[in-house]
Amino acid sequence: MKFKHAKPLALAAAAVAISAAGGAEAAVSPEKQISFLAEQAAVWGTDAFYRDWLQDDGWCAITDLDGNKRLELFFVRAVRNPVPGMNDKGNNEEKGRALVATVPITMRVRGFEVSADGKRLEELKFNYPDKIIPPNLTELREGFYNAGDKTRFYHTYTLNRVRDLGFCLYRQVISLKNGTVEVQTIGTEYGNYGLFMEAATAEAIFDYAEDRHGKKMQEKELSDYVKAYSAGASPADFNMRWIYSEKWKKAQNTPGGVRNAFAENWKEFRWQLKKDTR
């Protein structure tokens, strides 16, 4: 399926020398926290959310998004439903509809954080001040630091199918502070998927965009609007990876596999302010 992702943002912001964001001291080493997280399956792995997450081949990851040295465990799954007339073995248009059906209609997210004493697993809250659009955390791409409120924040893109062949691409900003994940939807791009008898594809055709206040604009205007949102923040060298379904199922069937999967995943997490190159 052809889909034009939004271009990476090029932000010019000065890096500042700071201590770990959040200011909290880590009482427990990351290694011990990882072991603790793996042992807490009774907390994160027994309810309906987890069963649906397994069935939908979701993703999970170990992070420290707020920089308080208390590790987080996030679960993300995509919710999908059929598109009328879809048939992955039919004609090209029917195959195109089957491709569109792979686009989620919404996401489901859940997160936990190790307590300061390392003895409890606390479920994170999600707050939506704009629109209740659960974010696709697997698309977290850029990290920033706001010196004003000493908060790390991240940009993500959440693509949802709307009705049969429509879509919305939500431009979102994510931050975590004091146990709450703040999800701000600062812009939305609207469009539809075009189908063709000549080829088994579905092409994303953008219609218009609007900012968080409902002001309509073109795609480039929205990109500039999103860029301006982070103009006063310091960019970070940010990286994280997700544990996919196949690896997760293998880990579950291996002694110590979940802890090892968590440990390997944590090694991929990186957050460091970029040097000022001016």
Residue ranges and their predicted role:
Residues 27-61, 69:
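N-terminal "mature head" segments of proteins
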Residues 16-25:
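C-terminal segment of classical bacterial N-terminal signal peptides
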